[in-house]
Amino acid sequence: MADRPNIILITSDQHRGDCFGFEGRAVKTPHLDLMAKGGTRFSNCITPSVFCQPARASILTGQLPSTHGVADNGINLDPAAGEAGFAGTLARAGYDTGVFGKAHFSTRATYQPTDTPECKTGSQSYPDDWNGPYMGFSHVELIVHGHLSKARANPIPPEGQQYERYLASRLADGGAYDMWATELPPSTGAAQTWHSGLPVKWHSSTWIGDRTIDWLRGRKKDTPFCTWVSFADPHHAFDCPEPWSRRHAPEAVDLPQHRPMDHARRPRWVRTAVGAEPIVADPAIREPGWPGQR
């Protein structure tokens, strides 16, 4: 199997590349430290986009946003481009391929319904036993609402995919979402940061890890595999459950160096994009919690 190695790609969302124990920071990541020591670290990786969908499409296809066409959130990746990416290429070479967690190759909140499994309306047409294929992956178990929000209604199946159905099935009448939104004392004083009352065993990170392990244990051992384990955190809202939410005392965290905006050395379009106020004709778009907001 040396010429056809097994591959596990692990990603986290909106996570500083140096915020690990193995990078010398004062954070406790012993399991990640072991994996970094025995695996491959992408220490010199620079994302081609600060936005989620373009960056994920680039990981899958190996192309820049200007080539694969996903220039911003809200633009779906062409399925043909997705199929030509690393997952489809390996699948055609005889690999078992899977993705677990947040794929975000397609848009959840759309003005018009689409037929993608990640669309809030399109996902409702997929049966409960659907597990792919999708964008070159032969097996998928997805989180459609990667980040829950108190500012909008939470997904109730049939909207969503595997994780949404799992979480909704824990308690009747949306009880699991109520537990997630429960703030345990003491309050942080920040709107999107709290000690969540959701049991850690129901959290999306636990679910992603467990589903990946079950898939690896249940597959044929004589076939090489490639799986993308895509954790949706630590992206805000910072809603970690106990005991993990109290693992680090705030005063013990070594903050990164603050880097002020240096627009003078940046291209004009960067200065315009960062410093200008967008022209919005529809006042509803300015309302907090509008689905299209980043």
Name what the model sees in each region.
Residues 1-294:
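Formylglycine-dependent sulfatase
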